[in-house]
Each structure stands twice: as C-alpha cells, then as structure tokens.
C-alpha cells in the first residue's frame, strides 16, 4: 500500500452508479452526506464529486456535479455483449465507469485538488486509475459491500491505495481474501447513525404491535421472508400488523415477478386477518417517524449484508431487532437482538412470537438495541476517516 499523510479537506468521490440526493440515492449517498456534516463540526468541509441526477442534490457547498453520458448496461442485447467485450480489453467493469473516472480526474485538475486526500467507495478500478493520475496522493478506499473487479485491477488494487478499508470486519476479511491483502491490514470503518434523528418513540404507539421492514423490496433484502413468517405467526395470534417500508428502487417500483410475489403474500396475510401497510418509497427525512410507528424491526436479508444502515437505524429507534445472521449483521447487532439463520422463516417466526408474547421483553430488547446503536455514530466514523487520511 502507498503511504502518505495529509491535513487537507478530503475529496470524497462517489462510486460510478451512485448520486448525491436525499430522494433518489442510496446508502453511500447517505454516508457521504453524514460524513460531510460531521467533518463540518470540526471545521473541515470536504469536497464531493458525484454524478448528477434529475433530483435536487444535497445542499453541500463543495459539491462537483458531473454530467456525463449515462450508458445503460443493456444486458442480453448485441450492444450489451459488445460492452462486455470491452471489459475484457480495458478491464473497466463498464464503459461508463471509465467515462466517469476520466470526468472525475478532469474535475480534480480544474479545481487544483490534485493533492487530495481522496476517499473512494466500492470502486477499485477508480482507485487504480486515481493512483496512476496522482501518484503521491493519499487514497482511502472503503468497501461497503463485496464488489469484484477484473483480474487486471484486482492485481493492482493493493498497491494503489494508502488505506484499504471496509464498513465491517466481515467485508474487510472478504477484501483481504479477494485481493490478496495481508490478513489484518485492512481497516474497519463502521457506518454510523444520526442519534438525534433516529430516537425511540416517547410513548408506545396505539394498536397491535407493528413489525417493520425497511429497505429495497428485492429478493436480496428478503421482505418475502418476513411476510411468510408473519403468515405462520397469524395461525397463533392476530395481535400484530406488518409494515414494509421501501420499494424496489430508491425512487419507486416497477412490476416484476418479485413485486408480484410480495403483492400475493401481502394479500394472503391480510386474508389471514393481519393488516399490511406498504407505503412505497420513504424519503430520508420521513424514515425516523415511520420507524417510531413500530415495536419490532426485522432485517431478513438473504445476501451478506456488510453493515446495513437500516439495521442500526431500527436499533437507534429503540425497536427490538430480529435479523438474519449474514455478513456483518452480527457485528452490528451483537447481543442486543435476535439472530436467525439465512432463509429460516421458522426461526424468524419463533423469535417474533417470543417478542409478541412478552411486552416487557420487547421493551428490554428495544433499550438494548438503542444502547448498542449509540456505539455507532457518524462523528466516530468521521474520526476514523480523518485518522486514516492523516496516517
């Protein structure tokens, strides 16, 4: 790894597919915004370089919006196969990735930011490209999830970065194995949560206990598993309801087989006498209030969730948490919640039944979850980032 040190404001470079808006962006966008806010408290104002989008960006003064041709992947078409062929030639995951990298470097040079330090996300190809262009700069690369790349960039990545980091120990171990980085040399930089925004409800909501899901409604996040477990619960008790917060995409849903499956399972659960609320896309500002309507928070992910923001946001809201034992989730939840094996709707239903049957236990695990969440703050995340760029 390249060594270096810097006391300058970092230049945070969004990954190729991400944008920087409070309404039509994902978790990395939230990370960038929260880190900027925490840095500002200490008199540091990072630069943010990101792709533009047809939505109002976060109101951050040092934002550089890049408007470059957005080329779809077009899988299964002749053009799509041609784009895959270029990957074998250039090593870039997609032609738009190379276009974005060139636009980023141009923007950096135009504004005299060549000395960095640079903070990158989920973009090992970009890290290698940046090292070629800025050989003496500090480059911190943070993996938010497992993001493989071509063999060319896989070999070059370890030598391109000053600090190789991940949002959990789980993703750091993946990174070491995948890139051949010596064990224990990657840096864990946990995500955070806004403890002033995500707070427990001051009083128990009226009505039956609400079991909540928050996130994208796709198969990897597995809201269907919650609905299936809820159907099993409904055979024993009708004293609960379910809310599914989110949509297939950050900006809404389009009909597909999985969304139709969720429709079917929701209808069957309502036929069983259980209310199911699915409001669709929830704006970031509305999420804390929506979570406070619930008493139990379920994270049923099938995929290896490295550090889900939805997990820690539910915990900070004082909800009893039940999550699948995948990826880094056990690191986040610790002993402050219930874990179940991937795909086990029976085990999930059992944990939910335990919490529904015992209001006192539900409250106790809600308090444990909040206390655990208080260990993960954005100020602490920024502190670790600051130390990394000054190393």
Regions found by a protein language model. Give the residues of each.
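A charged, aromatic-enriched C-terminal amphipathic alpha-helix characteristic of glycosyltransferases
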Residues: 95-99, 360-390
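Conserved donor-binding/catalytic core segment of Leloir-type glycosyltransferases
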Residues: 165, 204-221, 226-231, 242-245
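Carbohydrate-associated surface elements
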Residues: 170, 192
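Nucleotide-activated donor-binding/catalytic signature segment of Leloir-type glycosyltransferases, i.e.
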Residues: 256-285
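Short alpha-helical donor nucleotide-sugar binding micro-motif in glycosyltransferases
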Residues: 281, 289-294
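Short hydrophobic beta-strand element within catalytic cores of glycosyltransferases
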Residues: 320-323
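Short acidic/histidine- and often glycine-rich active-site loop of Leloir-type glycosyltransferases
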Residues: 326-339
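Conserved acidic donor-binding segment of nucleotide-sugar-dependent glycosyltransferases
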Residues: 338-345, 354-360
């Amino acid at each position: 790894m390249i060594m270096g040190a810097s006391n300058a404001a970092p230049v945070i470079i969004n990954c190729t597919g991400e944008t920087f808006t409070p309404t039509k962006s994902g978790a990395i966008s939230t990370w960038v915004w929260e880190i900027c806010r925490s840095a500002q408290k200490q008199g540091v104002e990072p630069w943010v370089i990101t792709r533009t989008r047809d939505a109002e960006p976060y109101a951050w003064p040092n934002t550089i919006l890049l408007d470059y041709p957005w080329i779809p992947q077009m899988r299964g078409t002749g053009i799509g196969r041609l784009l895959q062929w270029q990957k074998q030639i250039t090593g870039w995951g997609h032609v738009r990735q190379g276009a974005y990298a060139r636009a980023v470097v141009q923007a950096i040079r135009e504004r005299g930011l060549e000395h960095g330090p640079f903070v990158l996300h989920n973009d090992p190809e970009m890290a290698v490209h940046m090292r070629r262009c800025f050989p003496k700069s500090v480059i911190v690369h943070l993996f938010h999830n497992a993001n493989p790349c071509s063999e060319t960039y896989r070999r070059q990545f370890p030598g391109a970065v000053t600090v190789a980091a991940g949002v959990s120990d789980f993703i750091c171990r993946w990174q070491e194995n995948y890139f051949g980085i010596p064990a224990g040399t990657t840096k864990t930089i946990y995500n955070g949560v806004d403890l002033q925004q995500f707070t427990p409800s001051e009083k128990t909501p009226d009505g039956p206990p609400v079991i909540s899901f928050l996130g994208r409604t796709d198969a990897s996040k597995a809201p269907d598993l919650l609905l299936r477990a809820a159907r099993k619960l409904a055979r024993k008790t009708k004293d609960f309801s379910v809310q599914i917060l989110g949509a297939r995409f950050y900006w809404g849903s389009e009909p597909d087989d999985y969304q139709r499956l969720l429709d079917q399972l929701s209808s069957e659960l309502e036929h069983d006498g259980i209310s199911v609320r699915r409001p669709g896309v929830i704006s970031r500002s509305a999420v804390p209030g929506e979570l406070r309507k619930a008493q139990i928070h379920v994270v049923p992910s099938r995929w290896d969730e490295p550090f889900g923001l939805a997990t820690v946001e539910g915990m900070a809201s004082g909800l009893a948490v039940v999550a699948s034992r995948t990826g880094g989730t056990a690191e986040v939840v610790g002993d402050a919640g219930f874990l179940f094996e991937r795909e086990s709707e029976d085990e999930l239903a059992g944990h939910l039944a335990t919490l529904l049957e015992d209001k006192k236990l539900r409250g106790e695990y809600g308090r444990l979850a909040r206390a655990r969440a208080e260990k993960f703050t954005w100020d602490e995340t920024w502190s670790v980032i600051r130390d990394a760029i000054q190393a």
